[in-house]
Amino acid sequence: MSSILIVPIRPVDHAELAALAEPLEASFHIPVSIEETNYLDPSFALDSYRSQFNSTAIIVKILERFPQFNGKILGITAVDLFVPVLTYVFGEAQLDGTAAVVSTFRLREEFFGLDADPKLESTRLLKEAVHELGHTFGLIHCRNFECVMHSSTSVEEVDLKGIEFCGDCREQLTDSTSR
């Protein structure tokens, strides 16, 4: 049986990690655990020119750190992520692979100069975590704007999409997890 391992990447809010476990179990119907001792320091992935962290490099390091893990690995951090061809990303995943990473950096209201909204920010994090893990199960971006697998290039798009898989994506996920 497969499982999901949540890996803290400094800095990270442990309460956010704990709040993710149960909803992720409900979304994927597999056990979720949180790595309690093997934290990842993302400083190796810092691009000092951009003042951002390369999400692809973080995924590679996650895979190096947990080579024997037989499931999906989700890194969670609060640093600003990028891939070289984009200004920023909320997260990144290996398509039909093992690892993904999500950042809360641009999901927080404070980033936009607004007051914190923990409930909204928690919902955003869950949507992006489910989305990136969906990619690790082989799901691609969905055209259904209500589906959690719909691509989001802004926080407004994260807010607009749903928290669940549409029927087609759920069917693909079920096929993937039953293999």
PLM feature spans:
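Metzincin-family zinc-dependent endopeptidase catalytic domain
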Residues: 10-129, 140
